Amino acid sequence: MSEFLLIEERGGVGLITLSRPKAMNALSLGMVRGIAGALRRWKDDPTIHAIAMRGSDKNGPFGNFCAGGDIRFFHEVAMAGTPQLEDFFTEEYALNYLTHHLGKPLIAFLDGIVFGGGMGLCQGATHRLVTGRTKMAMPETLIGLFADVGGGYFLSRCPGAAGQWLALTGQHINADQAISLDLADWHIEAAHQTAAWDGLQTLDWTKAQALDTWLQGHTVAAQAGPPYPDMHAWGLINRHFSHATVAEILQSLDTDPDPWAQETAAGLRKRSPVMLHVALEHVRRARTMSLADDLRMERDMVRHCFHSAHLGRSGAATDTVEGIRALVIDKDQNPQWNPARVEDVTLQMVEPFFQSPWPVFSHPLKDLV
């Protein structure tokens, strides 16, 4: 059990509170293991009728859900070359899979920050509740990584070209945008979350409509409307991010005088050129994959991110560790990507990220079906 988790059972509900406010509930290996252990136990417990998850901030429950994986930890263990890095990704991805296969309601209160690993933790929930404070993102390309934790699976199933846009740019989206892109289900007032959380624990689970009645009393369902709250941006997303390659996307953005297009192009050029190509190919491949196959592919990919043998790099020499250094460790915001330009990335640099370093029978996630 992790010191950063509060795990309880009340009123037939399994309750998980992420409680690492100084790190915006970034997931440690201990937290991953604690959450997975609780979910596995409750999955087969007939006295647990539903499971709920929330985060906390310095003021108490709610405020932020989860800022993702602990990237300081990633840097530390990558530099040290310890096996904990391998353990983290294997166990985190197995947890992501588990959240989709509990066989009972999983209610995620997605208040505040919901980034990266937080998205992986919540996208398998049957009930994803967002607030006016919600900020969702898959910002991994900013640190030379890709949208993992099942990101290929759930982003590739967003409408239009939204998945490619989110995977490449790491753009933050709000509650209404998340609902429109099928990344959330219901809106709940931030101030009403405590009452809703407490109310879950008083339901009569012998009544088939108990959870539906609770939802009606505490949330607002998505309303029929335009496919995206900002229809101007929606048109630009689909126009530019439907192109087949990163170079074509950038060329399309560069030739569009719209400020949105110019800002987006400038943002993309701050990302790792190699990982932009990898991230786009990842979403395209995942579109026809099961969740299990996508997670296995992502496990292969993340291994190559920290051990890019085909590029002759490992540890600090990889774009991933360099990106973490620049963003989080030294905070100079000046990563030295290799290569430095999108135009210099070749297929030979990208394709090996999708080749498994393990035979099928010994893959770390071979048991996912």
Predicted segments, located by residue:
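Conserved CoA-thioester-binding segment of acyl-CoA-metabolizing enzymes
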Residues: 1-54, 364, 368-369
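Contiguous mid-protein beta-loop-alpha structural module that forms a pocket-lining wall or clamp
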Residues: 148-210
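Glycine-rich beta-to-alpha active-site loop
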Residues: 57, 99-143, 147, 166, ...
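C-terminal amphipathic alpha-helical interaction region
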Residues: 305, 309, 313-369
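Hydrophobic/aromatic residues within transmembrane alpha-helices
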Residues: 16, 53, 70, 121-122, ...
